[in-house]
Amino acid sequence: MSQQRGYRKSRRGYVTSNSMDKTIVVKIEDRVKHALYGKVIRKTSKVKAHDQGSIAGVGDLVLISETRPISATKRWRLVQILEKAK
């Protein structure tokens, strides 16, 4: 009897730091509309993601996916690098 995994979030963002071992910091930008005034506001959040091969560099556009807790602050993992930094 195999259990199916639940829905896992995936996000796109830019790598802001890769100085930690097997860890990258990804800046995720989200656009939300203000409830009263309707203006579109950019909200950003920074998350730590697991990078097994330490292949992502600063400025890379990456796809990350939610996963089980890897450490005290890591709950995301690197899926693929969408665009390398220039």
From Swiss-Prot:
InterPro entries: NA-bd_OB-fold, Ribosomal_uS17, Ribosomal_uS17_bact/chlr, Ribosomal_uS17_CS
Signal peptide (UniProt feature, chain positions): none
Keyword match GTP-binding: no
Keyword rRNA-binding: yes
PROSITE patterns hit by this protein: RIBOSOMAL_S17
Pfam families according to UniProt: Ribosomal_S17
A single GO molecular function term of this UniProt record: rRNA binding
Alphabetic keyword roster: Ribonucleoprotein, Ribosomal protein, RNA-binding, rRNA-binding
GO cellular component, one term: cytosolic small ribosomal subunit
Family: Belongs to the universal ribosomal protein uS17 family.
Subunit structure, as described in the record: Part of the 30S ribosomal subunit.
Job description of the protein: One of the primary rRNA binding proteins, it binds specifically to the 5'-end of 16S ribosomal RNA.
Name by which UniProt lists this protein: Small ribosomal subunit protein uS17
Organism (species): Tropheryma whipplei (strain Twist)
